Amino acid sequence: MDYHKVDPAFGDWSDVEHLAEKYYLMFDYMINHISAQSPYYKDFLEKKDASEYHDLFIRYKDFWENGEPTEEQVDAIYKRKPRAPYVEARFADGTSEKVWCTFDEEQIDINCKSETAKRFIRDNLTTLCEHGAAMIRLDAFAYATKKAGTSCFFIEPDVWEFLKECEDIVKPYGVTLLPEIHEHYTMQE
C-alpha cells in the first residue's frame, strides 16, 4: 500500500479531487502498522541496519530492556492474539529478529516515536490532505503508543500527545481526525 497513489481501478488523484469538490471525503490511514509487502519493510529486510527505514519498526531488541519481554510484560499487553505480539523478521544476511506485530504477520507495527516514522506519517497525512480529505480516520490509533510495562493500548498521556502531533499536521488543511480506538478507552486503567 502506498498513500501516494490511487489504485488505477478507481482512477487517479484528479478523480478523487473532483469528488472532493462535491462530497465530504473521509480517508482511512493505518497509523499503527504497515504492510509487510511495503517497499519500506522490504528495504528493511534487505538492508537491516543500513536501511533508511531501520527505525520505522519496533524492534524487540530495542524496545525491551533485555531484548525480550518478561512473561509478566507479555501478560500485561492488550493483545489481539494469544501470544506475544511479534513476527520474526528474516533478513537478507540470514539473521532474524523479532519486530512488533499487533494484528497479523502482514501488518508490521510502526515505531511512532522514531524520527523516521514521524516523517513518514507527516508525509502520508499531508498527501491525503492535499488530495481532498475532509476527514482522516486513524486506523488502530489506540495501539500506536507503546511503552514497556504497560498494556501498550491507549497509553496516557502519550496517546494524547501523539494525537496532537497528528492534528498539527492536518490543521492547516482544515481536516478533521477520527481516531479509531477499538475498545472503550477506560479499559486500559
Write out the residue ranges for each language-model feature:
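Hydrophobic residues within beta-strands of alpha/beta enzymes
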Residues: 136-138
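Acidic/aromatic-lined carbohydrate-recognition and catalytic surfaces
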Residues: 1-122, 126, 130, 141-189
